[in-house]
Swiss-Prot record:
Gene Ontology cellular-component annotations: cytoplasm; mitochondrial inner membrane; mitochondrial matrix; mitochondrion; respiratory chain complex I
Protein name, per record: NADH dehydrogenase [ubiquinone] 1 alpha subcomplex subunit 10, mitochondrial
Transit peptide range per the UniProt entry: 1-35
Post-translational modification Phosphoserine, affected residues: S250
Residues that bear N6-succinyllysine: K285
Cofactor note: Binds 1 FAD per subunit.
One term of GO molecular function: NADH dehydrogenase (ubiquinone) activity
ATP-binding as UniProt keyword: no
Summary of the function given for this chain in its UniProt record: Accessory subunit of the mitochondrial membrane respiratory chain NADH dehydrogenase (Complex I), that is believed not to be involved in catalysis. Complex I functions in the transfer of electrons from NADH to the respiratory chain. The immediate electron acceptor for the enzyme is believed to be ubiquinone.
Domain of life: Eukaryota
Annotated family: Belongs to the complex I NDUFA10 subunit family.
Length: 355
């Protein structure tokens, strides 16, 4: 049900991307609601990816354990390379890209809580897996946004984590007994039918910070919820990164690894990036036709999230039909959520009958 709401929010997000260049004049919504999106005629008339993609059109992800400085390094790399920075996708990522950008209630965001996970990771209500499932969907949505930006503008992108590294948290949760084996099977099923449509990043940057140092940083940060994270959980995250993620990604893309001290020198990291040849991975096999189909996919947010809801009964992520209907109607009653963007009088949209 929550993923159904995520699809609805994502659909309006794509309209918001189209409207990014539109202007409001005296409260009248400029009409971008004709749904002009990239399609077959654009491709046939010459709007092809090869005309805008350059050597600077790269997808870079910065990965690492909790509190390793990923955000700072990713932002600095993006600034120095002239790329677009995508901060890490959290629970409220769909909210940040739709409507007025303000966070919505938990009922509309997977009915999960990161703070509750830190406080009680073994909660019997299934919060831990709902959280992981929702975050995967949020990262999937963000990765599609990043690829859409790359294919539309040619500008490179830098993300903090991605759908390709999301599983490290699932493995850590399972190893610590926070979730059931059925949850792992459900996650892997969803992942297998979604991630296959996406190209991996051109480059993965991994910040290697020992668990004791991670814990010291968490304590220094002072978040009362994060301070309850155990060293065993952090160690399992690190193990998943080093034993599974990095070896797998090294076959698909370039990988750079830095210590905590080295990661502080973003200038040196950028120099290392400039020396990379980027001579491996599936991006080299792409042509205008394959990139055309990829762009069609990533601009259709409903299709992006379509297979995150699969017909498998799992108590952690399944709710009844009546509750689904009630929450859906409540969501539709929120300001600006009843109709497509530009058609909601309660948020000031005018001249709707002319659109």
């Amino acid at each position: 049900m929550a993923l159904r709401l995520l699809k609805l929010a994502a659909t309006s997000a794509s309209a918001r991307v189209v409207a990014a260049g539109a202007q409001r004049v005296r409260g009248i919504h400029s009409s971008v609601q004709c749904k002009l999106r990239y399609g077959m005629w654009h491709f046939l008339l010459g709007d092809k990816a090869s005309k805008r993609l350059t050597e600077r059109s790269r997808v870079i992800t910065v990965d690492g354990n909790i509190c390793t400085g990923k955000g700072k390094l990713a932002k600095e790399i993006a600034e120095k390379l002239g790329f677009k920075h995508f901060p890490e996708a959290g629970i409220h990522y769909p909210d940040s890209t739709t409507g007025d950008g303000k966070p919505l209630a938990t009922d509309y965001n997977g009915n999960c809580s990161l703070e509750k996970f830190y406080d009680d990771p073994r909660s019997n209500d299934g919060n831990s897996y709902r959280l992981q499932s929702w975050l995967y969907s949020s990262r999937l949505l963000q990765y599609s946004d990043a690829l859409e930006h790359l294919l539309t503008t040619g500008q490179g992108v830098v993300l903090e984590r991605s759908i390709f590294s999301d599983f490290v948290f699932l493995e850590a949760m399972y190893n610590q007994g926070f979730i059931r084996k059925q949850c792992v099977d459900h996650y892997n099923e969803v992942k297998s039918v979604t991630i296959c449509d996406y190209l991996p990043p051109h480059l993965v940057i991994y910040i290697d910070v020992p668990v004791p140092e991670v814990q010291r940083r968490i304590q220094k940060k002072g978040d009362p919820h994060e301070m309850k994270i155990t060293s065993a959980y952090l160690q399992d995250i690190e193990n998943a990164y080093k034993k599974t993620f990095l070896p797998e990604m090294s076959e698909k893309c370039e990988v750079l690894q830095y210590s905590a001290r080295e990661a502080q020198d973003s200038k040196k990291v950028v120099e290392d990036i400039e020396y990379l040849k980027f001579d491996k991975g599936p991006w080299l096999k792409q042509d205008n036709r394959t990139l055309y189909h990829l762009r069609l996919l990533v601009q259709d947010k409903f299709e992006v999230l379509n297979y995150t809801s699969i017909p498998i009964f799992l108590p952690e992520v399944t709710i009844g039909a009546h509750q689904t209907d009630r929450v859906l109607h409540q969501f539709r009653e929120l300001p600006g959520r009843k109709y497509s963007p530009g058609y909601n009088t309660e948020v000031g949209d005018k001249w709707i009958w002319l659109k």
